[in-house]
Amino acid sequence: MPEYPVNSLTTVWREMTTVNSGENIAEMAQNQPVMLVFLRHFGCSFCREAIFDIGNIRPTIEQDGFRIVMVHMAPDAATAVKFFKRYKLYPIDHIADPEKRFYRAFGLGRGATAQLFGLMSWIRGFESTILEGHGMSAPSEEIGDGFQMPGVFVLHKGQIKNAFIHQMSHDRPDYLEIVRCCEL
């Protein structure tokens, strides 16, 4: 993916502060590459699968010099921490965005019926929920918007270096491939 400036986003980046450390994304990404992961709602098995996948490869990503920041829609840190701990991804930098302002700033919208409820979503949902054991629960205000689509962005020195925009709710990105764009 070609590098492109994100002047319109830099203001938003400064406003995106982590719940746990109070740092903002603009400063973080100036110092080291950041893998910014926008999650679906915590009740979604695909969201839980993403947290699990990232937890498994976190040491490799961080050893390569990247910082991982999760963006979620839960209004309180306790809800997010519960899920991050469950998947051994705590402590982790995370940003609460219950109004989905940052999701919109990065071009992540709400999914259409076909993106969320197509046959492959049901098949992958069974795989993730039952076979992999991630479970699920109904969307609620405390865990996020059930129609929100996720995405992954690699940010560094004021630019988006790479991105993975989910076309379907069940897409399972290769996070290691996504960060390879910026190997230090």
Description of each model-found segment:
Residues 24-55, 67-68:
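Short active-site neighborhood of thiol/selenol oxidoreductases, capturing the structured segment around
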Residues 1-29, 49:
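N-terminal "domain-start" segment that seeds a small globular fold
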Residues 48-49, 82, 173-176:
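Generic recognition of short, well-ordered alpha-helical segments
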Residues 41-54, 73, 77, 152, ...:
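Short, thiol/selenol-centered motifs that function as redox-active sites or metal-ligating centers
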Residues 50-104:
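Structural microenvironment flanking redox-active thiols in thiol-disulfide oxidoreductases
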Residues 170-184:
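A short, polar/charged loop-to-alpha-helix boundary motif
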Residues 90, 97-170:
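Thiol/selenol-based redox catalytic cores and closely related redox-interacting motifs
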Residues 20-24, 54-57, 81-82, 139-140:
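A generic local structural motif
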